[in-house]
Amino acid sequence: MKTILFQGDSITDAGRSREDDSHFGYGYAAQVKEKLELEYQNRYRMYNRGVSGNQIADLYARRRADIINLKPDYMSILIGVNDVWHKFDGQENGVEAEEYFWIYSSLIEEIKEALPEIKIMILEPFTLKGTGNQAYWEEFYVEVLKRAEKAKAIAEKYGLIFVPLQEKFDVALKEAPSEHWLLDGVHPLPTGDEMIKQEWMKGFSKLLGEK
């Protein structure tokens, strides 16, 4: 049985249980888990280790306990928006785009050194204008795009699968307003999670070498 690990911040966490590994919360990871269990039954063991509020440095700090020790065969990572959000919301926290890149690089290198056979997907950080970021929207959007560019650069640097999301949400605005997809410009509603799930599955097919 192969192991799949979902890593990230609150978008991945989505209210998951800390006591019951089968309770994935209510986000895209739970939707992916349900789909994979339906289609493949007992082929995969799955863990959700997203932690609400996490930035790239937080994920790096728990790399052993929540990544390496779980020995996943496949892993997806969605991280970066909090490095921007916590810069603007009064916490004066997070790291700049260049530091984000180097911490992310160190994370991937240490994971691959410990688990040389692991296959990794990098999900693109994304945002839309909403109640959580409208006060500083233009600068916020620019900063998220910088992390998105760095996330793509990480995937290219290490030959990983990159899953684009920002353009998908931008295009979705033609169908419905931001609040239809994201609660506050950052956290997905079920419709937003469904979109992430679809893109995750496309990336996973590439990871498996399927068309």
Predicted regions and their residues:
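Serine-esterase "nucleophile elbow" of acetyl-processing enzymes
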Residues: 1-52, 57, 63-71
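Alpha-helical cap/lid subdomain in secreted, periplasmic
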Residues: 31-42, 61-211
